[in-house]
Amino acid sequence: MDNPQKFSNSKEVINFLSESFPACFSVTGDAKPLKIGIFQDLAQRLEEEERVSKTLLRSSLRHYTNSWRYLHSVKEGAFRVDLDGQQAAPIEKEHADHAQAQLEESKAKVAEKRKAQNAAKPGAKKSYKSKTVPAFKSSPKGTNQDNVKPKAKLPPPEKLSAEQLVAGTSVTVKIGKSPMPATITDVSKDGVQVQLDTGMVVKVQVDNLRLARSKR
């Protein structure tokens, strides 16, 4: 006959204990505080059980009693139970205080570990902050739709009247595709001589000139 396979971890042992002693151990719901000396009772009851060693049984019991669920159950005045669920001695204040201190310390360690893990992953927060709304494009600094609209409503530049066609008048002259600011320096029959803001002097026809807008 083959030997039964031994348990390999505390989880398997705790599941086994909850099935074998359901009035004492559990894996869900509220835990029950265990009788002092429960390990000796377990060692006697499981003496013929080949699947669990005493070493693994001891570590599994320590794992069970250090769980938050179990520590919550250790309150002053509550009764401990034996393997059959029978009441044993009540929990003393000293033991209850110790359990609460263990619980708070354990929770603090978990919170600190979680905080360290979050701090080690700044990429997640950074990528979240750097997301842009795909439906809209940001406007250049200092401009927005309200600033752009008035420019589209401006009337076209005026042609020069005979009175304005004199030296000293500020104009714009169309050279290439873009109008350039200039000042009339001389008017003759064959054209108008203007000086660009760049300092260049050119002669153009009157039709290429427009009255410069007054600066506000």
Curated annotation (Swiss-Prot):
Top-rank lineage group of the source organism: Bacteria
Biased composition (Basic and acidic residues): 105-115
Xref: InterPro entries: ProQ, ProQ/FinO, ProQ/FinO_sf, ProQ_C
GO molecular function: RNA strand annealing activity; RNA strand-exchange activity
Gene3D superfamilies found in the cross-reference section: ProQ/FinO domain
Keyword rRNA-binding: no
Annotated region described as Disordered, given as residue ranges: 105-159
Record-level GO cellular component terms: cytosol
Location in or out of the cell: Cytoplasm
Keywords: Chaperone, Cytoplasm, RNA-binding
GO biological process: one example: post-transcriptional regulation of gene expression
Protein family (similarity comment): Belongs to the ProQ family.
Known role: RNA chaperone with significant RNA binding, RNA strand exchange and RNA duplexing activities.
Protein name: RNA chaperone ProQ
Species in which this protein is naturally found: Pseudoalteromonas atlantica (strain T6c / ATCC BAA-1087)
Gene designation per UniProt: proQ
